Design a protein with these regions (language model features):
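Long, charged/polar, soluble alpha-helical segments
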Residues: 1-89
């Protein structure tokens, strides 16, 4: 069984934070999907904030899960054409 190390958790925080900072919505503001894009970003940011909360409480597993949900929302938005490609490096 793999162990969730502090290093792994920090790496996931960095990847998700970078994706949130570099995110670019590619649908115009007058496109009907713009509100959907904003919802995806907001949801991802909320999961990222949850991850920080869990980390501060010492709950690494929940922090890791919340980070995966956050990144999942960003990746889903990219997949349906709301965002530019997200860098993983």
């Amino acid at each position: 069984m793999d162990t969730l190390t502090d290093e792994r958790l920090e790496r996931e925080f960095k990847v998700t934070e970078k994706a949130l900072k570099e995110l670019k919505i590619i649908v115009s503001k007058d496109d009907k999907n713009h509100e959907k894009a904003l919802h995806f970003v907001d949801t991802a940011k909320r999961y990222y904030a949850d991850a920080k909360f869990f980390k501060e409480k010492g709950d690494k597993a929940s922090a890791f899960g919340a980070l995966n949900y956050a990144f999942g929302w960003l990746d889903a938005g990219k997949s349906i054409g709301l965002f530019e490609a997200i860098s993983l490096s």
